[in-house]
A protein has these predicted regions:
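Membrane-embedded alpha-helical bundles that constitute the cytochrome b-like, heme-associated redox core
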Residues: 1-210
Length: 210
């Protein structure tokens, strides 16, 4: 059977990259939200009512998941940026040209997409850099280590990491909503093609046995 609707290698690659981004971002975000809901510190019966509560894993387990899945997310994100670098350069050039000429060739949908992608990229960059800083710079035992105070205090970096993450998650949800049709369309083509191919192989095998 001839499959008329084929998925190009570029589209397939982009879909796989986006799927990897989605999964790693989802796990990193959920584990990050865990830390917002269940802050560290306090004592039993003290001001932190959630002290000592364990959900699936202990806090150290959530920290491990958040850290290493986030590194995986950064790696996939950099790959995504490399493969889409031409689009980034061309879009940036169009924006600066539009500002210079005081006119735009983009419609409202395109401008919204560029704005969301800009917030998404900036949030990713700041969140990733602040996260790497918090990972590399030692906190010290019980948080009593010497703070090197690079630009901000460690608390400042933690706040930057938190709110850039919130901005990234918000933009990612909007981005996902904008491109939901593309995600479903490509997924349907990819998996339908695989199902048809498997059926053809099974039919061919049966015919050969007969």
């Amino acid at each position: 059977m001839e499959i008329k609707k084929r998925v190009s290698s570029t589209t397939r690659r982009n879909w796989i990259l986006d799927s990897g981004l989605f999964l790693t971002a989802l796990i990193a975000s959920l584990s990050g939200i865990y830390f917002l809901i269940f802050p560290e510190g306090g004592y039993k019966g003290g001001r932190n009512p959630y002290y000592g509560i364990q959900i699936i894993f202990e806090r150290e387990g959530w920290e491990w998941i958040h850290t290493w899945i986030s590194f995986g997310f950064i790696a996939v994100g950099l790959l995504h940026l490399i493969f889409h670098w031409k689009w980034v350069v061309n879009t940036t050039s169009r924006i600066f040209h539009s500002l210079k000429e005081r006119k735009t060739s983009m419609n409202k949908a395109s401008r919204l997409n560029v704005l969301v992608d800009g917030v998404l990229g900036l949030g990713f960059l700041i969140c990733a850099l602040s996260g790497v800083y918090l990972f590399v710079v030692p906190e010290g035992k019980n948080g009593l280590g010497v703070d090197p105070m690079i630009l901000f205090s460690r608390t400042g970096w933690d706040l930057v990491h938190t709110w850039s993450g919130v901005a990234f998650i918000s933009a990612a949800i909007i981005h996902f909503g904008i491109h939901w049709g593309w995600v479903v369309k490509v997924a349907r083509k990819m998996f339908t093609r695989k199902a048809v191919f498997a059926t053809e192989q099974m039919t061919l095998s049966i015919n050969q046995d007969i």
